[in-house]
A protein has these predicted regions:
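Conserved core of the PLP fold type I
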Residues: 10-144, 160-175, 358-363
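Conserved glycine-rich beta-strand-loop-beta hairpin in the small C-terminal domain of fold type I
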Residues: 250-264, 273-293
Length: 428
């Protein structure tokens, strides 16, 4: 529900009394409907995905590995703990999961350098690209992680956001690997409004899994991190998935998908790189092909690009450096909520319109985005055939501006390619 107001079905329950047990029982039912039988002893609640991941990493210890790029809220948790975070390239066709061979090589390198790799975080729907990794790719990453002795945390916060009802369901890796995967689901933005922080974790029903759950619960208790009482009843209702909420969720996903595909079409037609989005609420656009035109404007890296585009567009964008990308990579994440309108109230008509792209706000936002792209394309000098700009500003252009062969380098969680401690505003 990111970018939209809370429906009365949820906001009207803020004053109702509910306990953690009500939310846990609803969560068990939510997972059971997706083929993932879950007992209450394996479920843990927290006030938001960031707090839950922070506690889980504190409980497990060691370095973490993440696909590059990754969700903006993953890396800061490692930084807060003073842990090293090591980005791993993804396959060229989609994000969310690391290339298995690159993962194994990264683990070997970290071990040679004296590191302590213990946790891999991946996503079944990739934020920021909006892509969905194939189940075979997820399985390959999990097998590689198991061979490296890594604990796998799967972020399933966006699993219920496919843009089209005709797309295959997003499956949980925990169905095929029930003893090896910790499932993390941030309800804020998916089943609840984005500013209602409540998250769930499902731990394997094994001695090791339940021990990790207990240690994670201890970390949350030590931090005084408990879900806000008024959110428990709405969360339990959202997890029960009554028909009216399911219909609204489908309408929201459809609206995000329409503007995401429209922006993708405009970006690629102008010569930029972008993977076709299938789910979620964002699009990652690589403007590397316009490097010289951007340099003429003083735009040399992702920080400059973010500032330049935010001054020219009516909606916010965020530089790829906030998502673990190298600073020289000229990529930005576009939250699709901004394309639908400047406020939740302005976006609401898109849920019922037969043609949301014809509404004034989406039409204006897409038109301005297209104008910026046309300007860059018109001022970019021609390049010799077969040359272009890779994500780091050198070499040959790759599919969607990314190359799974680039193994990258590890980054210290205190420095490098994260957000630098800044909040990613509007990253809905």
């Amino acid at each position: 529900m990111a970018g939209f107001a809370a429906p009365a079905e949820l906001s009207g329950r803020l004053g109702e009394t509910a306990g953690d047990g009500d939310v846990v029982a609803a969560a068990c039912g939510y997972w059971a409907r997706r083929g993932l039988e879950t007992g209450p002893e394996g479920v843990l609640l927290a006030p938001g995905g960031g707090a839950l991941l922070l506690a889980l990493l504190a409980a497990r210890g060691g370095d973490i590995l993440v696909p590059r790029p990754c969700a903006a809220w993953w890396l800061p948790q490692a930084r807060l703990l003073g842990r090293a975070a090591h980005p791993v390239p993804t396959p060229a066709e989609y994000g969310g999961v690391p290339d298995p061979y690159a993962l194994m090589e990264t683990v070997r390198r970290v071990l040679r350098e004296g590191g302590d790799p213990r946790v891999l975080v991946l996503g079944v729907v990739d934020d920021p690209t909006g892509t969905v990794p194939e189940p075979e790719a997820v399985d390959a990453a999990l097998e590689a992680a198991a061979g490296c002795g890594l604990t796998v945390v799967v972020d399933e916060s966006l699993r219920d956001t496919p843009h089209s009802p005709h797309h295959p369901l997003v499956l949980s890796p925990a169905r095929a690997h029930p003893d090896d995967v910790v499932v993390l689901t941030d309800l804020a933005g998916a089943l609840l409004p984005a500013d209602w922080p409540l998250a769930l974790a499902r731990f394997p029903a094994t001695p090791a899994g339940l021990t990790l759950r207990a240690r994670t619960a201890d970390a949350l208790t030590a931090a005084g991190a408990r879900p806000a009482g008024p959110l428990r009843a709405p969360a339990a209702r959202a997890l029960a998935e009554p028909p009216e909420l399911r219909a609204r969720a489908r309408a929201i996903a459809r609206a995000h998908g329409l503007v995401a595909r429209a922006a993708h079409a405009r970006a690629t037609a102008a010569g930029a790189f972008a993977l076709p989005p299938r789910a979620g609420r964002s699009l990652l656009v690589d403007l590397g092909p316009f490097r010289e035109a951007l340099a003429a404007r003083g735009v040399l890296d992702a920080v400059d690009l973010e500032a330049d585009l935010n001054a020219r567009l009516p909606f916010p964008v965020h530089g790829g450096h906030r998502f673990g990308d190298p600073l020289p990579a000229l990529r930005v994440r576009m939250p699709t909520a901004g394309l639908l309108g400047p406020s939740p109230a302005a976006r609401e008509p898109a849920l019922t319109s037969p043609d949301p792209l014809a509404l004034p706000d989406p039409r204006r936002a897409l038109s301005m985005f297209e104008a910026v792209l046309r300007d860059l394309a018109a001022t970019e000098p021609p390049h010799a055939p077969g040359t272009g700009h890779r994500q780091d500003g050198t070499g040959t252009a790759t599919h969607a501006g990314r190359d799974s062969r680039d193994t990258g380098t590890g980054t210290d969680a205190g420095t490098g390619t994260g957000t630098g401690g800044r909040t990613v505003e509007g990253a809905e």
